[in-house]
Amino acid sequence: MEFCVLFGGASFEHEISIVSAIALKGVLKDRIKYFIFLDENHHFYLIEASNMHSKYFAQIKEKKLPPLILTHKGLLKNSFLGAKIIELPLVINLVHGGDGEDGKLASLLEFYRIAFIGPRIEASVLSYNKYLTKLYAKDLGIKTLDHVLLNEKNRANAMDLINFNFPFIIKPNSAGSSLGVSVVKEEKELNYALDSAFEYSKEVLIEPFIQGVKEYNLAGCKIKKDFCFSYVEEPNKQEFLDFKQKYLDFSRTKAPKANLSNALEEQLKENFKKLYNDLFDGAIIRCDFFVIENEVYLNEINPIPGSLANYLFDDFKTTLENLAQSLPKTPKIQIKNSYLLQIQKNK
């Protein structure tokens, strides 16, 4: 089976997406037929596999290529010889952050009826917004940390709204890769941390920061009616992974398995199933959990994990190919114009 990797995007995580695509190339190799790069101006470019390396993008060489136009059948390439349609195999949405995870690309691909692996519109909206993710989890009976949502209007009252003690962690409500994330240990650090977070999002989420909390990551997808899980990873970190650590982490080929009981692993999987069903059909996602006093809490849902979290799967290629055979289908609406014909008939 052949794939097309779509990456880049007008996002703070633009470079993360490039690194992610380069890493996935090393995993899937010649199964990737096309690499389609989306730049910050929403132009599409076809990138040769031989140019899929950091130096090429650092020098912005893709700007010398002719831009492509997305159509119902694939990508339209104009040249002096005339227009040519590049028919796309199954697309892997690997655009992190804005465009890829907020639902824009899902909307576009669904609109043009282009088959893709990735979160659909509703799944993107709920998982990209951390506050909405918490509401979604609560509705499913899954615990989340206490939290306060701030915007520019109420940020001046932050200390009155926060009902938990220092230290706490401040995050942009709609951003990933630890962009704009700070641990605040005393009040004098608050304004700077808020300024940093508001650079990336119009809203900011504040949660208690628990030093040394047990964290477990689990990736997976649903293939037909059965779930396919990765093994559970326990991130090796001190306070939290910053942007640079996550950025470099995508190149890894394997992650150490977590040492946890069968009972806890089953709990994580059951929570994953609740979160996935049926909202995330067609996507490989990663759920990050905390375990506090033997209780499982959802930290966040990553709808497009770095390099699709391939390093957590024992057989990623088979998982991807099986998922490709189990994608959700949007029913085609039949337009019969019967109402209009009836109006015409009655005239």
Curated annotation (Swiss-Prot):
| Associated pathway | Cell wall biogenesis; peptidoglycan biosynthesis
Q: What does the record give as cofactor? A: Mg(2+); Mn(2+)
Q: Where is the ATP-grasp domain?
A: 134-332
Can you tell me which residues bind Mg(2+) 2?
Answer: 300, 302
Q: Quick one: which residues bind Mg(2+) 1?
A: 288, 300
Q: Where does ATP bind?
A: 161-216
Any one GO cellular component localisation term in the record: cytoplasm
User: Where does it localize?
Assistant: Cytoplasm
Q: What Enzyme Commission number does this protein have? A: 6.3.2.4
Q: Which UniProt keywords apply?
A: ATP-binding, Cell shape, Cell wall biogenesis/degradation, Cytoplasm, Ligase, Magnesium, Manganese, Metal-binding, Nucleotide-binding, Peptidoglycan synthesis
**Primary localisation category:** cytoplasm
Q: Provide the reaction this enzyme catalyses.
A: 2 D-alanine + ATP = D-alanyl-D-alanine + ADP + phosphate + H(+)
Q: Which SUPFAM superfamilies match?
A: Glutathione synthetase ATP-binding domain-like, PreATP-grasp domain
Q: Which domain of life is it from?
A: Bacteria
GO annotation (BP), single: peptidoglycan biosynthetic process
A single GO molecular-function term is: metal ion binding
Any single Pfam family the record assigns to this protein: Dala_Dala_lig_C
Enumerate the PROSITE patterns for this protein: ATP_GRASP, DALA_DALA_LIGASE_1, DALA_DALA_LIGASE_2
Any note on cofactor binding? Binds 2 magnesium or manganese ions per subunit.
Functional note:
Cell wall formation.
Family (UniProt): Belongs to the D-alanine--D-alanine ligase family.
* Name this polypeptide is given: D-alanine--D-alanine ligase
Organism the protein comes from: Helicobacter pylori (strain HPAG1)
Which gene is this protein's source?
ddl
